[in-house]
Amino acid sequence: MGFRFPVKTKLPPGFINARVLKDSFKRQQAADHEVTVTALKYIARNTALPTRARMEAQLQLAVMPNYTRMTQVRNRCIATGHARSVITDFRLCRTQFREKAKNGELPGVKKGVW
């Protein structure tokens, strides 16, 4: 059985399923290509540069694989792998956040009383 992704990646901590692996791979690739993508976007949007250079930068951006884009990355819960209703500061979905907060496992979080 061959490797599923074009480049080897390290396994993420916490819960692992196929979606978490795919998201982790996309995160790593987006981080690796971040400088290149930023430079190409700057060149493509700079009106002071010649049109040919700008067009070549746009073509290079278009040819890059989808997994190198930050828009492909999805926030996921590190405990369950859920993608919806994730609280970004804790990287937990709402149900896991509620359970861990009730059990006192999240430092600085307590039940609201007013």
Swiss-Prot record:
tRNA processing listed as a keyword: no
InterPro entries linked to this entry: Ribosomal_uS14 (IPR001209), Ribosomal_uS14_CS (IPR018271)
Keywords: Mitochondrion, Ribonucleoprotein, Ribosomal protein
GO annotation, biological process: translation
Subcellular location: Mitochondrion
Keyword Aminoacyl-tRNA synthetase: no
SUPFAM superfamilies listed in its UniProt record: Glucocorticoid receptor-like (DNA-binding domain)
PROSITE patterns in the cross-refs: RIBOSOMAL_S14
Major subcellular location class: mitochondrion
GO cellular component: mitochondrial small ribosomal subunit
Molecular function per GO: structural constituent of ribosome
Membership in a protein family: Belongs to the universal ribosomal protein uS14 family.
Protein name: Small ribosomal subunit protein uS14m
Species for this entry: Eremothecium gossypii (strain ATCC 10895 / CBS 109.51 / FGSC 9923 / NRRL Y-1056)
Taxonomic lineage of the native organism: Eukaryota, Fungi, Dikarya, Ascomycota, Saccharomycotina
